[in-house]
Amino acid sequence: MTEKNSKKPAVNIVQIILTIFLVGAAFAIGSMWTELKLLKSGKGTAVNQPTQEAASPQPEEGPLSDEQWQEVLADPVYSEGDEKAQVTLVEFTDYQCPFCKRHFDQTEDQLQSEYIKTGKVRWVIRDLPLSFHQNAHLAAEAARCAGDQNKYKAMHDQLFETQTAWGESATAKTVFSGYAKTLGLNGAAFDQCLTGGKYKDAVDADLALATKIGANGTPTFYVNGQPLVGAQPLAAFKALIDAALQ
């Protein structure tokens, strides 16, 4: 009896170790499977996913000089919020960039409700259409043409919401003309603006400015001159904005 009883603890320990091993293995396999599904669905974390498209690899950006910051603030394509706000958020964007769309889908409305519409932040948009996005430059021009009829933001939203419909289209100009009519614009005036290339040079000027200050990927943001690169979560913006508001 004594001998049989003395072996039971050893058996129990083996069983416990085996159980722990199996549970741990099952957890690891489950975690890997969940992560794989998230990555396939495009819902992975920012750590595991790229947040920006770049024209070429660039070193980490530093804050803008006062001179650069004033140049970035001058004559933007669009601005919203209190012009006397303590903080200005500048966004360099590309309408065909998937990461710019991610920012539009996930973060823009939160910034609007918490900072821009409350008068804490002025929001400025500048164009940075990357050369490998075939319709990005034309889209930037389309938004500006809509701006002639006070519909810049409406076209801005429309372009991001329908990005996959026109991004690789060979008839993007026709698509944009249709958007103009949907938004209630004067179609003839819009078409004349877009076909005539009224804002081609203005978009090119924004591109040149972006290159000059070292913004070579999209989206790129500056909070009072401090850079924030990529489609970052609201928390990343809050850290810079709240610090600037103090």
Which residues make up each language-model segment?
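Structural alpha/beta surface segment adjacent to cysteine/selenocysteine redox centers
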Residues: 85, 90-181, 186, 213, ...
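Short clusters of hydrophobic/aromatic residues that line enzyme substrate/ligand-binding pockets
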Residues: 78-80, 166, 228
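Glycine-rich, flexible loop/turn motifs
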Residues: 74-76, 162, 190
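A short beta-strand-turn-helix
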Residues: 70-87, 115
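N-terminal low-complexity, Pro/Thr/Ser-rich intrinsically disordered segments
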Residues: 49-76
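Short, well-ordered turn and helix-capping elements at secondary-structure junctions
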Residues: 76-77, 127, 207, 225
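C-terminal cap of thioredoxin/glutaredoxin-like
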Residues: 1-55, 108, 177-246
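Extracytoplasmic/periplasmic mature domains of Sec-exported, cell-envelope-associated bacterial proteins
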Residues: 65-69, 134, 168, 236-239
